[in-house]
Amino acid sequence: MIVTGVYDCTTGRNELLQCNTFFKSYNGKSIVVICDDYINSPDYIVSLYLNRGSECVNKISSLFVIISADSTGLHIMCDPYGSQWNLFYCVKDGLFYYSTSMKSLLSVCPINRTLNKNAAKIFLKRGFLIDGQTLITDIKCLTCAQELFFNQDGLHVQHYKYQFKICNYSKSDARNMLIPAIEDSILAYFSKADKSVSLPLSNGYDSNLIFNTIRKKCNDKEINVFTIGGVVGRNEIPAVKENIKGIRGVQHYTDIIDKELLRSFPDIVWRLEGSLFEGGVFLQYALGKLAQKAGITKMICGECSDEHQKSRFIKDMFNVTHGKYHPNYRYYSRANPFLTTHFVVLKKSSLMLNSFGIRGCYPFVNVTFTQLASILVSDNLNCLNLAYVHRRH
């Protein structure tokens, strides 16, 4: 999914050079919505946006990017988690260029391609970049809970205040509500018209919960599961084969990562466009390649489940979305579960799958799940484990 455009503040013209997603024109305003439309439809998001402006974010449950332009200026915003899609942008000669693809942006924007050396140092140390920096000096990237405005007064970027609702359920009620809430989120990602469902399947709780929910609620659909193992380290293929043995209607695709995958390193870098680098990208690359070969265009993934169950997640989300965080780079570490969700875990999966023409669906990146998890979570116990223990007793 690629959206590329250029906005001229002197004429108020927004020219879409590429757009294979939802577009609507309303009273002289053009609006592009890239969203998780299984959860919230683009029309619903546009309606909220037109009525509430930036405050629409507090009523939208899905991941999204909104691009709105009229004669007065351009406004772009993304969801609090930073979206599945990057939004790169730069300003050159009074024109504002933007795209969901770095390669596409570079093909239309006549800027000097200068390496951002400070950003490169951070990237080599952390594996990802923050505060909207990229590896190219003049190109920036919209990050979690951010919005930007561009008009004749120039460019203004800020964090909007996301009002996350804290629920006052008892722990007992939250335990009883957790699994049904996750099941509802999973089931929202496919319709009766879908003949099959596809997902990565490991030996962990999150993917098995997705798998068992689909089996239980949609036993009329074929299930395609994908497991990637490794020659070195943990190989979960045998365990997964044992778990699904004897279950009808399941097609199991597998692949093994070995040293030969290193030959694909240039292709991996090309697909991620300098957004991040982490050891897990090799697994994601193998997964995307295997799923593409099988003709899959949509996968339901368990990413971000662990991060949303960390005791610090809500606090870190509040600090980031309200601008109450220390600007020093050392603050941004893997110990921050909210930023890890945005900069590493979600993007690692979504960007790689998107590069193979596969849409990733993420039922654990869900407001209700986060609300319930925040009640149940503790430093030493994963709340999904807690829910399973509770049900077994």
Model-inferred region functions:
Residues 73-75, 152, 159, 164-393:
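ATP-dependent adenylate-handling active sites, centered on carboxylate activation for C-N bond formation
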